[in-house]
Amino acid sequence: MNWGKWLDYLYPPRCPVCDRIYADGICADCRKKLFVITEDFCMKCGKPLEDTQREYCPDCSRKRHVFRQNRALLSYRGPVKLSLYRMKYANRRDYAEIYGREMAVRLGPWIRRCKITRIIPVPLHRKRQRKRGYNQAAVIAKSMGRELHLPVD
């Protein structure tokens, strides 16, 4: 038995949403509970829009950002909110890997259409990185980069 199989035996892969043992990312039950943002999203930050006649959410229409555009995959509520909390504060790097792959699959067509040539993770302040033990955005970005064959800076 190789090391990977031993690790899976000792620490079986889990669904990042419900934390039940599941070998392939997000389980089917949890997929049904997710609010995937597919349309009617802010053209600046990627949040879902309540007023579908607008291009920008109220926050982005009031302030300037240093980036051109951002996309979000999931709405930050319910089980996703708890899952992301565990990813950030309970050192669940495996969740970050899964979310990175999920983003690559679901946002890959948009990324290719926009002709994005590299992925740049949001830097994390040194104090926060020391406290959390890692930069979750960097792990997500590396996972996306592997799936999409894009460099990560």
Where are these regions (language model features)?
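Glycine-rich phosphate/pyrophosphate-handling loop used in enzymes and phosphotransfer proteins
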Residues: 1-153
